[in-house]
């Protein structure tokens, strides 16, 4: 086919969609170019046949940033790109979330999306271009997909309002970083962090983005009209109405009763018994459905039972109404040797969160397309299998753990002190020890508590809450503090974190169409009510940061020296600073402007290092008495060391009021003596006196 190109204006940028020139053997391939800044190649391949052994939709999204795109060669021994970075993993999730619900229910063919950043000027983030390209590639692929989608990034400034698709520079000055994706009539995904914006401002940003990305959807439709392949012939399997009716008739009441058991493990055990009974009764005989089909039908009855109960106003699975937060149990300082710790329990969800303070050298080094930079704040989330009572794989963090950790990080980062106020590197680790819904928001609450327990001067405490939705026709119910089952069986996962003043993070994933502005308003309102409730209970335990750091935390001393003294502190080949660090057991970081940060495992170590630096950088003061060591004796006097690297001359005439024939009659090398600084000339030479010390002391020097 001949290349097809579509151009359109999107905010302050011109976007070009091109297909038919590159990657023509893929089901769909689109090269997206934004101005001359970013080019992303997006390919989509769909398997023509489903794998009968997979009981789920095998969609995979891979976003990758090639270093050649920015004119760089990878570091390391092999000089090629390795495992996905955290940024690549997070962007892959960002693309996956809005497209997954648009594939038809029951579609089980494998689909793989690969987004490759092939060129960038390092001015803007390529993620929006990748999302637009994914929408376009799916639209022309012929794969069953109820799109296209649009996507946009929104920034906000009090004076100028909302800004579409900001550059990195514009984003740095913004109080909001929000990515929104959706179809022409519905929002499907929101990912954001903010600096205490109001609920109305956050909702306004979502609606602003939805209006603005309609131009993307229209452009993709125009591209598909010219370049799309024929849509696959695919139809869902017919609904097993007889099987569903049989299960509901004989086991419906028992299933409904099982969902009144409030303890998760007991509920799952009872449902497991019922599932086994249903499979034993309705499968296995000739002419009966397979066990897999019966289990699927049983799951459908579970789905309908829970949803019908909720929209009809019945109590939720654990007996709560739609607005109640589960009981909280909050502890701080639970681990005696850590710098700060908290145990946050909400119902059957529990997070053990630990804060650790380190030096500037402990900051995470990030090698990105934009260049190397250091991140002084890390938040890591771990979800071991025992937290849900299962055996499972133990190892490195998966995509879900990276995503949840980043959400928790977004939630608290705006409330951390500035680096010039608190120059420590901070690492927070959230260990999920129990899970039944919203462990990421438990991590937010636990992180805020642990940081305050560690003495990090937080601007305000932060709490988070997960909201859910069940919508059947015109009926709907917004749920506060959802359980794991309500997340799985519901239509929305809506997480809000913030302070008493405003929102610091908002994440939303919608599984259905038709989420209205009214529903989002209600969800934000209920989330605010719940957040204030949780903050109130947190404040009863610890309402503000401790005034002193933990005794286990390193001591930091900040000081500043003249820039021309930096080389004296460092010494030849770093010998001086290395000796100070080795002898005092402290670490020293020196900036080009003369700023020095000294970190010691103890206060004594840090102070010892500070005194050494002061000694090197101090200047001899005229009229001040020093205790010095005689370094060298000459015929006309003696050279006395009064400060590190600074010797002064005591002339023979300044040794004593009496006449001195030989200097060695008064002094010997290595002797400690008191000397008075008489003068420092313009070449830095120091003139000393011994005979004037007594008079200077008498005058009060």
Curated annotation (Swiss-Prot):
Family label: Belongs to the polyribonucleotide nucleotidyltransferase family.
Protein name (record): Polyribonucleotide nucleotidyltransferase
Gene3D superfamilies: GHMP Kinase, N-terminal domain, K Homology domain, type 1, Nucleic acid-binding proteins
Species name: Pseudomonas fluorescens (strain Pf0-1)
Gene Ontology CC, one term: cytosol
EC class of the enzyme, as a word: transferase
This enzyme's EC code(s): 2.7.7.8
One Pfam family named in its UniProt record: RNase_PH_C
Record's subunit section: Component of the RNA degradosome, which is a multiprotein complex involved in RNA processing and mRNA degradation.
Membrane-spanning ranges: none
SMART domains, alphabetized: KH, S1
Domain S1 motif, chain residue ranges per copy: 623-691
Lineage: Bacteria, Pseudomonadati, Pseudomonadota, Gammaproteobacteria, Pseudomonadales
Superkingdom of the source species: Bacteria
Signal peptide (from-to): none
Cofactor: Mg(2+)
Subcellular location(s) of the protein: Cytoplasm
GO molecular function: 3'-5'-RNA exonuclease activity; magnesium ion binding; polyribonucleotide nucleotidyltransferase activity; RNA binding
BP GO annotations: mRNA catabolic process; RNA processing
Protein's gene: pnp
Keywords noted in UniProt: Cytoplasm, Magnesium, Metal-binding, Nucleotidyltransferase, RNA-binding, Transferase
Summary of the function given for this chain in its UniProt record: Involved in mRNA degradation. Catalyzes the phosphorolysis of single-stranded polyribonucleotides processively in the 3'- to 5'-direction.
UniProt catalytic activity: RNA(n+1) + phosphate = RNA(n) + a ribonucleoside 5'-diphosphate
UniProt-annotated binding residues for Mg(2+): 487, 493
């Amino acid at each position: 086919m001949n290349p097809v190109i579509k151009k359109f204006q999107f905010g302050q940028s011109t976007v070009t969609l091109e297909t038919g020139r590159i990657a023509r053997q893929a089901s769909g391939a689109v090269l997206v170019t934004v101005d001359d800044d970013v080019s992303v190649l997006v390919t989509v391949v769909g398997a023509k046949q489903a794998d009968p052994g997979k009981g789920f939709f095998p969609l995979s999204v891979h976003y990758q940033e090639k270093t050649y795109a920015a004119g760089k060669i990878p570091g390391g021994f092999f000089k090629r790109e390795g495992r996905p970075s955290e940024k690549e993993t997070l962007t892959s999730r960002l693309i996956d979330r809005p497209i997954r619900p648009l594939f038809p229910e029951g579609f089980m063919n494998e689909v793989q999306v690969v987004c490759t950043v092939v060129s960038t000027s390092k001015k803007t983030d390529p993620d929006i271009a990748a999302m637009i390209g994914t929408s376009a590639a799916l639209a022309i692929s012929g794969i069953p997909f109820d799109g296209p989608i649009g996507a946009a990034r929104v920034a906000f400034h009090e004076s100028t309002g909302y800004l579409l698709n900001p550059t990195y520079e514009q984003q740095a000055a913004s109080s909001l970083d929000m990515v929104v994706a959706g179809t022409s009539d519905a929002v499907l995904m929101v990912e954001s962090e903010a600096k205490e914006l109001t609920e109305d401002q956050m909702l306004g940003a979502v609606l602003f983005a939805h209006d603005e990305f309609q131009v993307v959807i229209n452009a993709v439709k125009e591209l598909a009209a010219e370049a799309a392949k024929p849509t696959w012939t695919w139809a869902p399997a017919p609904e097993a109405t007889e099987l569903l009716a049989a299960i509901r008739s004989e086991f419906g009441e028992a299933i409904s009763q099982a969902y009144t058991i409030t303890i998760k493990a007991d509920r799952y055990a009872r449902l497991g018994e019922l599932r086994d009974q249903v499979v034993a009764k309705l499968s296995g005989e000739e002419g009966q459905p397979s066990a897999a089909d019966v289990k699927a039908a049983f799951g459908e009855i579970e789905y309908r039972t829970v949803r019908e109960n909720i929209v009809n106003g019945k109590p939720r699975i654990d007996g709560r109404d739609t607005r109640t937060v589960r009981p909280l149990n909050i502890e701080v300082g639970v681990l005696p040797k850590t710098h700060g710790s908290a145990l946050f329990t909400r119902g059957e969800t529990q997070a053990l969160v630990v804060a650790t303070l380190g030096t500037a050298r402990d900051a995470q080094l990030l090698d990105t397309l934009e260049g190397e930079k250091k991140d002084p704040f890390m938040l890591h989330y771990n979800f071991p299998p025992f937290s849900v009572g299962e055996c499972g794989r133990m190892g490195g963090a998966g995509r879900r753990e990276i995503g949840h950790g980043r959400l928790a990080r977004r939630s608290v980062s705006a409330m951390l002190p500035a680096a010039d106020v608190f120059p420590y590197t901070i690492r927070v680790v959230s260990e999920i020890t129990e899970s039944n819904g919203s462990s990421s928001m438990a991590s937010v609450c636990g992180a805020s508590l642990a940081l305050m327990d560690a003495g990090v001067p937080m601007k305000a405490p932060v709490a988070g809450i997960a909201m859910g939705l069940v919508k059947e026709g015109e009926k709907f119910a917004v749920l506060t503090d959802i359980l794991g089952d309500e997340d799985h069986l519901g239509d929305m996962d809506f997480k809000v974190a913030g302070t008493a003043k405003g929102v610091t993070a908002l994440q939303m994933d919608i599984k259905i169409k038709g989420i209205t502005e009214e529903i989002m308003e209600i969800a934000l309102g209920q989330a605010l009510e719940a957040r204030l409730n949780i903050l109130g209970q947190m404040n009863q335990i610890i309402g503000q940061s401790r005034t002193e750091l933990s005794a286990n935390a390193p001591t930091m001393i900040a000081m500043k020296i003249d820039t021309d003294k930096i080389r004296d502190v460092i010494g030849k080949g770093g010998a001086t600073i290395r000796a100070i660090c080795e002898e005092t057991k402290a670490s020293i970081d020196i900036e080009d402007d003369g700023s020095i940060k000294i970190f010691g495992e103890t206060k004594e170590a840090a102070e010892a290092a500070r005194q050494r630096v002061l000694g090197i950088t101090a200047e001899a003061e005229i009229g001040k008495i020093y205790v010095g060591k005689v370094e060298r004796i000459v015929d006309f006097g003696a050279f006395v060391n009064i400060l590190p690297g600074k010797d002064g001359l005591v002339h023979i005439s300044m040794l004593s009021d009496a006449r001195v024939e030989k200097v060695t009659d008064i002094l010997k090398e290595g002797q400690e003596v008191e000397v008075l600084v008489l003068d420092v000339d313009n070449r830095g030479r120091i003139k000393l006196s011994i005979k004037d010390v007594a008079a200077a002391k008498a005058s009060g020097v």
